[in-house]
Amino acid sequence: EDDIEADHVGFYGISVYQSPGDIGQYTFEFDGDEWFYVDLDKKETVWRLPEFGQLTSFDPQGGLQEIATGKHNLGILTKRSNFTPATNEAPQATVFPKSPVLLGQPNTLICFVDNIFPPVINITWLRNSKSVTDGVYETSFLVNRDHSFHKLSYLTFIPSDDDIYDCKVEHWGLEEPVLKHWEPEIPAPMSELTETVVCALGLSVGLVGIVVGTIFIIQGLRSGGTSRHPGPL
């Protein structure tokens, strides 16, 4: 089939999976960016940014009904077909700051978790080994081309050389929780020996410059003196 070219693309739909507990979601994406999803537990629409909810609205009951219908149909199809349960994949996590880090300046840490399947996961933030809940936001499960998922968790924070952070990932595909560590990279202060060496090198370069400059001046004076001697008549 030929790909359809368009200036903008909106995508909405449900994802349901047979697994212990409720696994399913209803999402809406526009040009590849998530606008909202329906929270199954709270039964409410969760907007990716508060401003999106001011532009339009969505009744979460519509999404919940579609998820319920999808689960019902999935159960029927499962009973009528021979199927092999999908294996649990081990997710991969990466932590990085949203902006260049400056101590004392507000910033956001991003924990990007990829290769998630099935879409059931716990992502938590730790600061100095203690759980952090304030300033935390995460997306719904976003679909990859291979039908696995990825998810992003955000933590707003103020960088300090006293704090270290970890993104903790728990998933059925992992034998134990994975911690992805992050701390601000602060240049180490120079030791006294290093400072002495740097000063000595700077002094040496300066002396060499003075000597070379003096030589050029002397040569210039000699050349000038020679040119002033009168030639033969």
From Swiss-Prot:
Extracellular face residues: 1-195
InterPro entries from the UniProt entry: Ig-like_dom (IPR007110), Ig-like_dom_sf (IPR036179), Ig-like_fold (IPR013783), Ig/MHC_CS (IPR003006), Ig_C1-set (IPR003597), MHC/Immunoglobulin (IPR050160), MHC_I/II-like_Ag-recog (IPR011162), MHC_II_a/b_N (IPR014745)
Keyword Transmembrane: yes
Record family assignment: Belongs to the MHC class II family.
Location of the region described as Alpha-1 in the Swiss-Prot/TrEMBL record: 1-88
GO molecular function, one term: peptide antigen binding
Region: Alpha-2, residue numbers: 89-182
GO CC term, one of those recorded: MHC class II protein complex
GO biological process, one term: antigen processing and presentation of peptide antigen
UniProt KW keywords: Adaptive immunity, Disulfide bond, Glycoprotein, Immunity, Membrane, MHC II, Transmembrane, Transmembrane helix
Short name of any one Pfam family annotated for the protein: C1-set
Protein name: H-2 class II histocompatibility antigen, A-F alpha chain
Organism: Mus musculus
Every Ig-like C1-type domain range: 91-183
Gene: H2-Aa
Subcellular localization: Membrane
Residues carrying covalently attached carbohydrate according to the record: 122
Phosphoprotein among keywords: no
Membrane disposition: Single-pass type I membrane protein
Connecting peptide: region residues: 183-195
Positions of disulphide bridges: 111-167
Membrane spanning stretches: 196-221
Cytoplasmic side: 222-233
